[in-house]
């Protein structure tokens, strides 16, 4: 029983620390997109964005380090970034891959920054399904439509053509920070937050 009590106390302690960190992050208008992109993450991030937007129109800082995940969950965050009034200043860190890159691309280009050692991954959506041939064909068509939509999004974000995006992402398309700048995905590589130019400055 003592072990259980200690475990419970430890869990409560970690939860309290996490709550305090979240409270402070919201106070300084910072949102962290870390780990796999799924429904829970999307819900949490979108709620934070709307809370911050309701407080003021000051810029929001979003740090992205994600291996990707569900495209639809990435869409939810992408649309929220575009929906709210405050500008979102995006900082890529570590790995910005797949659905993580989709979220990153939601910010205006002048507000997209990268730390020096960040790697970016663009690729076509993938997935598997089992069932009747008719369902498989429907799923295949939806994957094609999703790919075309993502091609358009990344074309708009980078200045590349949808055709080039489509060709480049036929296989995993990795970019380091410098290459991401050349490709048009990143505006500027920074090593300090002092190098960020706030909207309107």
Curated annotation (Swiss-Prot):
GO terms for cellular component: cytoplasm; endopeptidase Clp complex. PROSITE patterns: CLP_PROTEASE_HIS. SUPFAM superfamilies: ClpP/crotonase. It is an enzyme of class 3 (hydrolase). The keyword DNA repair does not apply. Cleaves peptides in various proteins in a process that requires ATP hydrolysis. Has a chymotrypsin-like activity. Plays a major role in the degradation of misfolded proteins. This is ATP-dependent Clp protease proteolytic subunit 2. The gene is clpP2.
